[in-house]
A protein has these predicted regions:
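Glycine-rich helix-loop "coupling/hinge" segments at transmembrane-helix boundaries
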Residues: 304, 399-425, 510, 671-698, ...
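Extracytoplasmic/periplasmic sensor domains and loops in membrane signaling proteins
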Residues: 57, 85-133
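Helix-start (N-cap) segments at beta->loop->alpha junctions
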Residues: 155-172
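Short N-terminal helix-loop-first-beta-strand/juxtamembrane motif that initiates sensory/input modules
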Residues: 60-88, 177
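Membrane-water interface segments at the C-terminal ends of transmembrane alpha-helices
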Residues: 195-227, 240-352, 380-400, 432-449, ...
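A short, hydrophobic, proline-anchored segment that marks a local hinge/packing element in signaling
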Residues: 136-148, 290, 572
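Extreme N-terminal signal-anchor transmembrane helix of membrane signaling/transducer proteins, especially
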Residues: 1-25, 175-177, 182-186
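Membrane-proximal extracytoplasmic alpha-helices
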Residues: 21-55, 59-66, 158
């Protein structure tokens, strides 16, 4: 009981700290937006100040009649600091009286001084105007439109009733949420299995707040026209041949990319994990390189090499080959090269966790190597294969950066959605097209679950083999390694183009060697680089731990709403970045949760967006672990936290590492959703790279892409050192 009480207190202290951070972020952002709106009103009204005493009097009278939002008083002669007024103010009587009485105070003196220098000033505290509530006071210069001289000062008073009402609602909301949360946590901790109940409550709260609610806002927007409910947007989309063609184009692209990426990813994972092939470190490095680079860097490299004026395209034309990289073939190529690491990272953990005693038994019973592979190894890898295919498929559907540059005549929904949002400024159409992408994603999701649920894939039983069995002959191993080296050479060629761009003065125009790009790029990107690393470092451990907890609950626990929770957790991966960005802007730019413009909304976006990768990897690994291991630990008195920390997490270590790695690199290289969520205070390096590329500053873009790759590779090394190898799972090829 004492231990549970201590855990409860510690949990609530953590909740208080996190809640206070969220509370202050919401409060400060609301006040910032409110005061910015008031300042814009002051600027607009002050810009209309007329010339002549009669005109000023009439203008003040008109303002008093037309506006209930603010009061205005005019001070004809600006006093010196600390002195009283020499002329009576005009305008609102109560505000004029306050101005006359308070003119010599430090706050009003500072306001008059700012007005004299043609600047707008807001007092640091609110003032009581007449018998009304406290109001916010602004000072602005009264500039004659003809002479452009400052004729006096304008004093504005804004009601703070709205701000105070919002603060009361915010305080009530947070206090009520805290009390409710405390009661729920207490009940869960005092229950028989409190940790599981608490985890389920947290996951449901997280998905409802940051998945269901934003999607509802986006869905609601797709049914609105001119502020009223309408089916017009959906009728236009479903009756448009162009939009339906884009849907078919997305499906074709997704299927081809997912198939080729899964094959390439499995080839890399199998050679690295299950053979004694040479250069494994090089293969592993090249196997993750594409996923850690900006999503458009490979596309730019391919265009520079194989575009209409590419280096290789010119050579092909010399020998009479008419070749174009634009369209479906080019997109499949660039997406496969960019997305096969998703399959590689997922399948590596699965193949490493397969207990090789089954393969040894098969070989001892005179089965051939290929028969053992096809009957034992491959079926046991099916969960990982399906998970990898699903993840790549949804990634391909949601991709817009590559189609933006390489689509050619091919229409895809993600690109059409992006164009609707950024080019046509039709948020409803963009949201509707993005929502349409959920149909094929959910279909693939349900098909995968239905297939996998009918099979058993338990291989880790608590007595793992200390080695793995070589299933390939030397000839086959050389053949597989040869294919990989061809792919590796192609990737090196692509990234060599990026590296070469760092030292070229202006790619495509002036190929003179220069170091100016490096100096300029690093100087202009310091703040954005620090912001990106900070936000990614915060999101990575959160996403990794939450993913493993969610996977454990989905695989090991039975509870009401399990399928709903699983669907909500997996949905973000299917969403185009534009939809996720739009959804978050729509959902979190007003009460009760205002996060737009803060670092929190970017971190939350990272966690929610990349969570499905870790969950899929965790599910695939947990299906290979015999539940009796955890049951034995529980029978010996271990609680759920100990079981998770000491038993489950070490056994799913490969999947956990993959989740951490993938979250960090995707956070560092995100662009589609982040481009909507960045602010002047929190910028992102990939957006800066994209801006440089868009402005044809390929040298600067190449430098930042190279720096980004170096940072992420360094993070990979640190992550490997922090999470040590589990000696029980170490395997050596024999």
């Amino acid at each position: 009981m004492n231990k549970r009480a201590i855990n409860f207190v510690l949990t609530m202290l953590f909740v208080v700290l996190v809640g206070f951070w969220i509370y202050t972020s919401v409060r400060d952002e609301f006040l910032k937006q409110s005061r910015a709106s008031q300042r814009r009103t002051v600027e607009t009204v002050a810009a209309g100040y007329p010339s002549g005493d009669d005109e000023v009097t009439e203008w003040l009278k008109r303002l008093a009649e037309d506006s209930n939002e603010y009061r205005v008083a005019f001070v004809p002669e600006i006093p010196m600091p600390g002195e009283k007024l020499t002329a009576a103010p005009k305008g609102d009587p109560e505000l004029a009286k306050l101005t006359e009485e308070s003119a010599a105070t430090p706050e009003f003196s500072k306001g008059f001084d700012n007005a004299a220098y043609e600047e707008i000033y807001r007092t640091s505290r609110n003032w009581t105007v007449g018998t009304h509530e406290e109001q916010a006071i602004f000072f602005a210069p009264a500039v004659d439109l003809k002479t452009h001289d400052v004729e006096g000062a304008l004093v504005f008073a804004f009601s703070t009733e709205g701000e105070q009402g919002f603060m009361r609602m915010l305080n009530t909301l947070f206090f009520g949420a805290f009390v409710l949360f405390a009661v729920v946590v207490w009940q869960l901790m005092m229950s028989r299995d409190p940790i599981v109940g608490f985890a389920l409550a947290g996951l449901f709260l997280m998905t409802l707040t940051f998945v269901a609610y934003p999607l509802f806002e986006a869905l609601r927007l797709s049914f609105l026209e001119n502020g009223k409910f309408s089916l017009g947007i959906w009728k236009t989309i479903l009756n448009s041949e162009g939009y339906l063609s884009a849907l078919w184009g997305s499906l074709k692209l997704g299927c081809w990319t997912a198939t080729f990426s899964t094959l390439v990813g499995f080839l890399f994972a199998f050679v690295v994990s299950r053979t004694n092939a040479p250069c494994k470190k090089l293969i592993s490095t090249m196997g993750v390189l594409p996923v850690i680079s900006p999503p458009f860097s490979l596309t730019l490299s391919i265009i520079l090499l194989f575009g209409n004026n590419g280096l290789f395209t010119r050579w092909l034309r010399v020998i009479g080959l008419d070749f174009t990289i634009y369209g479906l073939p080019g997109l499949v190529l660039v997406q496969t090269m960019g997305m096969f690491p998703i399959a590689f990272l997922t399948l590596s953990g699965v193949l490493q966790a397969i207990d090789s005693t089954f393969e040894e038994a098969s070989l001892n019973l005179s089965a051939g190597r290929f028969q053992t592979f096809s009957k034992i190894t491959l079926p046991l890898a099916v969960p990982g294969l399906l998970s990898a295919w699903l993840l790549v498929f949804t990634t391909s559907l949601a991709d817009f950066a590559n189609p933006l540059l390489l689509a050619g005549d091919l229409k895809v929904l993600s690109l059409e959605s992006y164009i609707e949002v950024t080019g046509m400024n039709r948020l409803g159409h963009g949201a509707a097209l993005s929502i349409l992408l959920l149909l094929p994603t959910l279909t693939a999701f349900l098909a995968q679950r239905f297939w996998v649920a009918k099979k058993s894939y338990v291989t880790v039983t608590g007595k793992p083999s200390g080695r793995i069995t070589e299933l390939t002959t030397p000839c086959v191993r050389r053949f597989l390694t040869g294919i990989i080296f061809v792919i590796v050479f192609f990737l090196i060629l692509l990234y060599g183009t990026i590296f070469a761009g760092c030292f070229v003065k202006n790619w495509g125009i002036d190929y003179t060697f220069s170091l100016e790009n490096i100096t300029e790029a690093l100087t202009r990107s310091t703040d954005a680089l620090m912001d990106t690393v900070t936000l990614a470092a915060i999101a990575t451990p959160i996403a990794g731990i939450v993913a493993m907890i969610a996977a454990l609950l989905i695989v090991r626990r039975k509870f009401h709403g399990k399928r709903l929770l699983e669907m909500l957790l997996m949905t973000p991966f299917a969403l185009p970045g534009t939809l996720l960005g739009i959804s978050y802007i729509l959902a979190f730019n007003h009460a009760p949760i205002i996060l737009v413009g803060t670092a929190a909304i970017i971190v939350i976006n990272y966690v929610i967006r990349e969570l499905p990768v870790g969950i899929e990897g965790g599910i695939a690994s947990l299906r290979q672990i015999d539940p009796s291991i955890e049951e034995a630990a529980t029978d010996l008195g271990a609680d759920q936290a100990t079981v998770f920390k000491s038993i489950v997490l070490p056994l799913v270590r490969p999947a956990f590492l993959s989740s951490l790695s993938y979250t960090f690199v995707r956070s560092m290289t995100a662009v589609s959703a982040v481009i909507f969520l960045i602010s002047a205070k929190w910028y992102h390096i990939t957006v800066l790279i994209y801006n440089f590329s868009e402005n044809l500053r390929f040298g600067l873009a190449s430098v930042l892409s190279t720096v980004l790759i170096i940072i992420v590779f360094g993070a990979f090394g640190v992550m490997r050192l922090l999470v040590r190898e589990n000696s029980n799972l170490m395997k050596n090829v024999t």
